[in-house]
């Protein structure tokens, strides 16, 4: 930051909007619209080709780089135990793929060799293929009209495309296994409510995304998950903070984060008393303390809370942890499914990354 730049206050609505020259807040707020676009395509019959009386042997998710890969990990973690067929996340189409399998291709690049190669293999071996990517170029040629297509309908940067991939995967799973009871409309409503809670006009004490920025301020940040789903979410948050806010944040399992936190406390790396009397002009910059944001689903909330109860530098973050205040909508406790909670937390982390970038000017 140079002398002409200044920090923007999180409650300065006009300053935040003026600093958002790239439209990042708007892009981060489109998750609900992206899900509705997928639901509309589903209603229009986009996935009729993959429906069938027989359940698939395996559902295979081949994701490109970034958010598509993360979405596959989240779907496998949350839906794997409920789906009639096992969900496999792979970098390419497996050699055993055949007519009994469903192949979902997800990404933002129709020229991606991994997606194109997987598409060609899936079509050649008779698998039911779903394309959740721009349907153009080599990817279109590889499928030759023999795939169900859920191409993106809204132009959104890949950083904010996680919820679209989640919705596409849920739609495909629902098509081959109607007993799952996937509700894309409820997911979209929840994401719209989250975006509204995190809007620039809401003050920090009623805004979950801004509150996260406050917690991360002047700290070394670790995003931690205690299961496969929240660990995938932590990695997404780490990636988004780096790509959007240029903020380095580690992503790891909760057990590793707690070990590091206790080790830092035992070493006395930051003495609270010394920090109180620290003079940066004489003593130099004070060392930043570690802040662990423990991401938790509702089902594991009480267990994770008990593990971190005695630690001051750990904050528990759940989808339903919404500050109370006038005009702030909150989700009914325990009413959201795991995939909905993950999507809500993903939007919260994405908007926090945007605010972190904007306040730095």
Model-predicted segments: where are they?
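Glycine-rich phosphate-binding loops that contact phosphosugars or nucleotide phosphates
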Residues: 54-196, 297
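Phosphate-moiety recognition in structured ligand-binding domains
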Residues: 1-40, 127-129, 133-148, 164, ...
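Short helix-loop-beta junction
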Residues: 74-88, 239-250, 310-314
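Short hydrophobic beta-strand segments
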Residues: 58-63, 220-226, 291-295
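Flexible, charged surface loops at secondary-structure boundaries
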Residues: 51-56, 96-100, 123-124, 214-218, ...
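Short, charged N-terminal beta->alpha structural module
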Residues: 25, 58-80, 229-238, 299-309
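N-terminal, Lys/Arg-enriched amphipathic/low-complexity engagement segments
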Residues: 17-76
């Amino acid at each position: 930051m140079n002398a002409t730049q200044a920090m923007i206050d999180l409650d300065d609505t006009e300053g935040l909007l003026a600093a958002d020259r790239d439209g990042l807040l708007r892009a981060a707020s489109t998750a609900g619209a992206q899900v509705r676009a997928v639901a509309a395509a589903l209603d229009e019959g986009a996935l009729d080709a993959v429906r069938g009386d027989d359940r698939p042997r395996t559902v295979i998710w081949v994701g490109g780089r970034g958010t598509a890969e993360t979405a596959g990990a989240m779907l496998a973690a949350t839906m794997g135990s409920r789906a009639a067929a096992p969900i496999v996340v792979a970098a390419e189409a497996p050699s055993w793929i055949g007519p009994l399998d469903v192949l979902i291709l997800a990404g933002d690049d129709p020229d991606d060799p991994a997606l194109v190669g997987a598409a060609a293999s899936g079509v050649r071996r008779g698998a039911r293929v779903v394309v959740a990517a721009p349907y153009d170029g080599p990817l279109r040629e590889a499928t030759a009209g023999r795939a169900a297509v859920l191409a993106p309908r809204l132009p959104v940067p890949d950083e904010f495309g996680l919820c679209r991939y989640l919705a596409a995967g849920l739609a495909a799973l629902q098509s081959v296994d109607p007993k799952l009871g996937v509700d894309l409309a409820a997911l979209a409503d929840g994401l719209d409510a989250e975006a509204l809670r995190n809007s620039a006009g809401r003050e920090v004490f009623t805004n979950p995304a801004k509150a996260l920025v406050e917690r991360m301020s002047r700290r070394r940040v670790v995003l931690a998950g205690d299961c496969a789903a929240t660990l995938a979410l932590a990695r997404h948050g780490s990636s988004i903070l780096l790509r959007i806010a240029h903020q380095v944040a580690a992503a790891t399992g909760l057990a590793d984060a707690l070990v590091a936190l206790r080790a830092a406390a035992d070493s006395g790396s930051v003495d609270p008393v010394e920090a109180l009397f620290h003079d940066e002009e004489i003593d130099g910059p004070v060392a930043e303390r570690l802040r662990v944001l423990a991401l938790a689903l509702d089902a594991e909330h009480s267990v994770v809370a008990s593990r971190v109860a005695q630690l001051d530098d750990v904050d528990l973050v759940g989808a339903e942890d919404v500050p109370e205040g006038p005009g702030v909508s909150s989700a009914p406790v325990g009413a959201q499914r795991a995939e909905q909670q993950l999507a809500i937390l993903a939007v919260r982390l994405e908007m926090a990354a945007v605010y972190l970038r904007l306040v730095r000017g």
